[in-house]
């Protein structure tokens, strides 16, 4: 089991995301629960980012929406960085 660490930025973007996309609230909550259990589950589509975002990972909520994060495997922590559309998260 991993501990989810909510950054201030993630907290703001998660609230905005939930307000704008009420239809995805349940899916978003389920993704966070699944991340806590095992971030490497295939349906999360966990992947490493490159370029200016090297060192950051992401998981998919849907084809259009992502959560960016950093996984500290030794500490069993997942540091949540941002949530939003593909373009918002990868800016």
Indicate residue ranges for each PLM-predicted region:
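Basic, Lys/Arg-enriched alpha-helical interface segments
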Residues: 1-65, 72-79, 88-91
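Residues forming the ATP-binding cleft of Hanks-type serine/threonine protein kinase domains
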Residues: 84
């Amino acid at each position: 089991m991993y501990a989810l660490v909510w950054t201030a930025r993630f907290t703001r973007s998660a609230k905005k995301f939930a307000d704008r996309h009420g239809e995805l609230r349940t899916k978003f909550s389920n993704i966070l629960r699944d991340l806590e259990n095992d971030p490497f589950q295939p349906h999360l589509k966990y992947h490493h980012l490159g370029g200016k975002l090297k060192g950051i990972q992401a998981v998919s909520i849907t084809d259009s929406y992502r959560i960016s994060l950093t996984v500290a495997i030794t500490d069993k922590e997942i540091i949540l960085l941002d949530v939003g559309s593909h373009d918002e998260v990868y800016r």
